[in-house]
């Protein structure tokens, strides 16, 4: 769960957007500019990313769930792969309005998807060809829209977002519900309201991989830590048992 300055440089984390598109609220995290492109200060980004990973690890160690969000073309496959590796829910195609604020309705759709999957496994021979086609189209749409959150039984305890501007609806919903946000913020967006800001390039696939892999590693370490604590507690608890001789009276 460690990232170095060199890794960030190689991933292009320091490359911001064109200076004319900058958000002044990102000024504390900008080192300067080169060829009209803002350069993000990695001496700020590195410790802030480490703080975000530490938080993700602690939250997961305490049985918390993190929802990973990345629906931009260059982030989709990376976010989905890392979320699956870490065993957490994710949104990689598009954010449906109300995914958090109207989670009760979303849960109904999740149940529908699971029921359809069970029906599909049992066989669709009883349906006509037209009905099978309609069925297939519906299940494909549900899988595309909510497949990544189908095992999410309750609201997440935190959300990790790549590009807070692109996912402003997700950010707004999380803020409204008081769900902590870990967000990658480029030079053209505001870090306000983001609990754990990661100042950096949100367009480069290499940078996106670095962020997603780091958070996924932290989640895995946190879960392993929690499992280790349980095993340790059971082992230590075994010392408390006192053997009672057979036939001993109360």
Curated annotation (Swiss-Prot):
GO terms for molecular function: structural constituent of ribosome. It comes from Variovorax paradoxus (strain S110). GO terms for cellular component: cytosolic small ribosomal subunit. The keyword Heme does not apply. This is Small ribosomal subunit protein uS2. NCBIfam families: rpsB_bact. Pfam families: Ribosomal_S2. Disulfide bonds: none annotated. Keywords: Ribonucleoprotein, Ribosomal protein.
């Amino acid at each position: 769960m460690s990232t170095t300055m060199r890794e960030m440089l190689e991933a292009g984390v320091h490359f911001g957007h064109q200076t004319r598109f900058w958000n002044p609220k990102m000024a504390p995290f900008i080192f300067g500019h080169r060829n009209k492109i803002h350069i993000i200060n990695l001496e700020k980004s590195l410790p802030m990313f480490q703080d975000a990973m530490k938080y993700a690890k602690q939250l997961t160690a305490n049985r918390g769930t993190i929802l990973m969000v990345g629906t931009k073309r260059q982030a989709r496959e990376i976010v989905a792969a890392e979320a699956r590796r870490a065993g957490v829910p994710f949104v990689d195609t598009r954010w449906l309005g109300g995914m958090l604020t109207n989670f009760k309705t979303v849960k109904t759709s999740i149940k529908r998807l699971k029921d359809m999957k069970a029906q599909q496994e049992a066989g669709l021979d009883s349906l006509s060809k037209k009905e099978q086609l309609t069925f297939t189209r519906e299940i494909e749409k549900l899988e595309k829209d909510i497949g990544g959150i189908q095992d999410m039984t309750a609201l997440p305890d935190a959300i990790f977002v790549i590009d807070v501007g692109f996912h402003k609806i997700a950010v707004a919903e999380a803020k409204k519900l008081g769900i902590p946000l870990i967000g990658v913020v480029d030079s053209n967006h505001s870090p306000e309201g983001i609990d754990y800001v990661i100042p950096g390039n949100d367009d480069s696939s290499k940078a996106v991989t670095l962020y997603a892999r780091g958070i996924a590693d932290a989640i895995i370490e946190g879960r392993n830590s929690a499992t280790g604590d349980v095993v340790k507690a059971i082992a230590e608890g075994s010392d408390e048992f006192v053997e009672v001789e057979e036939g001993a009276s109360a």
